[in-house]
């Protein structure tokens, strides 16, 4: 990502995503280049509710939540491409995942960097390549498929 860098703070993210505590997993957008990619940040705190049970003696962020954080970053990229006509009534559905791999654990105190690049859009389905990193090392990667629907429509 190089040309026009857009960054978004939590206040703007809250206007674009319907997620709220405890499932909002993007704290800031560091770079966003419409039609290309996004680089976002999740600060992983010991205060996250999932650490109570995963795992009490060795807290590790669940892999599915890393994937959810990547999907939320992809949603922010999608909404930069196509502004919803009715943002209050628009939902972003995660409809598929391919090639998910987990390479290292994510622990309290880590900064999870979420890199998502646009691959293609066909028949209402967005496809992205997504990589989550900690300290420059890959923590997780996957191809994500998503769609945008109104809240009253079935996914």
Swiss-Prot record:
<keyword id="KW-0444">Lipid biosynthesis</keyword>
<dbReference type="GO" id="GO:0005737">
    <property type="term" value="C:cytoplasm"/>
</dbReference>
<dbReference type="GO" id="GO:0019171">
    <property type="term" value="F:(3R)-hydroxyacyl-[acyl-carrier-protein] dehydratase activity"/>
</dbReference>
<feature type="active site">
    <location>
        <position position="54"/>
    </location>
</feature>
<dbReference type="GO" id="GO:0016020">
    <property type="term" value="C:membrane"/>
</dbReference>
<dbReference type="GO" id="GO:0009245">
    <property type="term" value="P:lipid A biosynthetic process"/>
</dbReference>
<keyword id="KW-0963">Cytoplasm</keyword>
<keyword id="KW-0456">Lyase</keyword>
<dbReference type="Pfam" id="PF07977">
    <property type="entry name" value="FabA"/>
</dbReference>
<comment type="similarity">
    <text>Belongs to the thioester dehydratase family. FabZ subfamily.</text>
</comment>
<dbReference type="InterPro" id="IPR010084">
    <property type="entry name" value="FabZ"/>
</dbReference>
<keyword id="KW-0443">Lipid metabolism</keyword>
<dbReference type="InterPro" id="IPR029069">
    <property type="entry name" value="HotDog_dom_sf"/>
</dbReference>
<dbReference type="InterPro" id="IPR013114">
    <property type="entry name" value="FabA_FabZ"/>
</dbReference>
<protein>
    <recommendedName>
        <fullName>3-hydroxyacyl-[acyl-carrier-protein] dehydratase FabZ</fullName>
        <ecNumber>4.2.1.59</ecNumber>
    </recommendedName>
</protein>
<comment type="function">
    <text>Involved in unsaturated fatty acids biosynthesis. Catalyzes the dehydration of short chain beta-hydroxyacyl-ACPs and long chain saturated and unsaturated beta-hydroxyacyl-ACPs.</text>
</comment>
<dbReference type="GO" id="GO:0006633">
    <property type="term" value="P:fatty acid biosynthetic process"/>
</dbReference>
<keyword id="KW-0441">Lipid A biosynthesis</keyword>
